Amino acid sequence: MSSPIQTAIVQTSETSAARLPLRVDRSAPIPQVKSEHHVLVRVLAVALNPNDHKMVTHFNMPDSIAGCDFCGIVTESSSNGTSLSSSAGARLPVGTRVCGALFPYSPEDPDNGSFAQYCVVDARLLVRVPDSWSDLEAASLGVGWSTISLAFSDPNALGLEGLPTQPSHRAKEPVLVYGGGTASGTLACQLLNLMGYTPIAIASNQSSELAMKYGASATACYTSKDCVDTVKSLAGKPIRRILDCITDAESAAICYSAMARSSGTYACLEECPDACRTRRIIKVKEVMGFQVLGVDIKLGDSTYTRLGDQKLMAIGIQWANEIQALMESGQLKAHPLRELPGGWEAIIEGLEMLRNGEVRGQKLVVRIPQE
């Protein structure tokens, strides 16, 4: 008996500067539920992230399904079809609308990505979507919150106090957010406010208003020659914690210059080369949101290779509950969205747009055809 198949966006071996190595495959395998903690989700909508085009370009794995962010409906909660006997089924029964994120860009799990009709996810890292949130809004959250959760709550990263629903920080300490107008930046600003911190955003002049709308207490323009002095003045006290949502030579230089003279922690969302680490006293943490999954990611001699860490997964599970509570209470809002019509092909076209730098201040989202 043949295995069930689905439509999905998969990687190809074709390399071209003009087009990403992706195609629509209408005979991709449907992933199987792996444990009592996992559920099968029918995908309703997906969001596109820069790592989706970066990973298929630099770590190409032909025939592997792509995609991280999603919103969908639980359709199976154990190996026994629609059984509700598992721990996952008890928490998220069949028919529940959920959102979350995967990391399909590793050889260990090539048949499980969000750019597909179905995906398998650990239910402990899923968020139940309230009626007040649309499929597209919910699809935009997974990668963002999982990454921010580790940047904030991992003691080896920023190690912030408390949680959004249980704030314990009282000093209103400034936290610098470089890239405050990005999807990660606007989410970080919202969560920092809820946790009792004071987010100061670095953004372009065009994105300044957006960052302020999402909770930044003040902004500085990264193109200004006075950017660092402005940031220090806005903070009013030494900055000891910085989140860099961009992570390139320019952003690292500004962040390092803005950091307190005595010490501080710099959490970045991409690799920070040694050449950018100009002050040894500053602690650096390259945050990879996929570590909330608690599994090994093996991508050769790169910063993306990480061993599974159950402590980081525990942070992710805790934050999944936090995000759900914030969504239900109306304390969280999605980054501005731009829906791309066209289904499967729109996903590939949208990733090309991201690669070419054609998207600013918006998160690209696509509805998955319900064939």
Curated annotation (Swiss-Prot):
SMART domains listed in its UniProt record: PKS_ER
Subunit-structure text: Monomer.
InterPro entries in the cross-refs: ADH-like_C (IPR013149), ADH-like_N (IPR013154), GroES-like_sf (IPR011032), NAD(P)-bd_dom_sf (IPR036291), PKS_ER (IPR020843), Trans-enoyl_RdTase-like (IPR047122)
Zinc keyword on record: no
Binding site for substrate: W145, S146, T147, I148, S149, L150, A151, F152, G289, F290, Q291, V292, L293
Family (UniProt): Belongs to the zinc-containing alcohol dehydrogenase family.
Induction text: Expression is induced in complex medium (Czapek yeast autolysate medium) supporting calbistrin production.
Organism: Penicillium decumbens
List of residues binding NADP(+): 51-54, 181-184, 204-207, 222, 269-270, 359-360
Domain of life of the native organism: Eukaryota
Pathway in which the depicted protein is active: Secondary metabolite biosynthesis
Name of the gene encoding the protein in the UniProt record: calK
Name assigned to this protein: Trans-enoyl reductase calK
Gene Ontology molecular function, alphabetical: nucleotide binding; oxidoreductase activity, acting on NAD(P)H
Keyword Amino-acid biosynthesis appears in the UniProt entry: no
Biotechnology: applications noted: Calbistrin A has been reported to possess a number of interesting bioactivities including antifungal active against Candida albicans and cytotoxic toward both healthy and leukemic human cells.
